[in-house]
Amino acid sequence: SQDLSIVESTTKMLLKRCPDSIIILKSTIVPSALSKLLKISRNLIYNPEFLREKYANEDFVNSPMIIFGGDRNIAEKVSKLYLDHSRCVNKDHIFTDLLSAALIKYSINTFLATKVIFFNEIKDIFEQLDVNDSWEKIIRTISLDLRIGSSHMDVPGHDGRRGFGGACFPKDSLAFAKCAKELGCELSVLTAAIKTNNKIRSQYKTLDKRES
């Protein structure tokens, strides 16, 4: 399970100073772990971020969805805070329960991680075929199918390497796979993607420390 010691201690400290505090969580926390935090305070709102590291400010302001998970009355207060005091373009906020917000966040991140690996393997096929068109044309054409979208198809990725790395996808994929296992469920596709990614990334001598 995730180590929530810092989150728990910070939450308790805030409640000690102000018992009626509304606590907004931005960190990516698996649903089962959030259940434990509810025992500390019912005034929790989970407001997950959907940011690319390279474009964090831009993505925050232009996020296609802003989710508030938790008690509806409390969540609406946080929503009003956004509406009154932020430059976020999206005004159509989404309200869910706490655990649903976490499930949505992890589903998106791990799907995109799996998508990265899928297109890494399609690139392997591309490189073995005697084709005249470029990889860029291939993925650009595939992306015209709106069901697939155009993101996370570049091989290599934005870091110049194959597979997925950085601060989010590796840790989120492992955490969600472990969460599923603890719940008696199996994320076989994600588990296979993690295994393939580990094999791909192992060829690089230097990696972001956050991947280890």
Can you name each region flagged by the protein language model?
Residues 1-212:
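Structural/interface elements that position substrates and couple domains in central-metabolism enzymes
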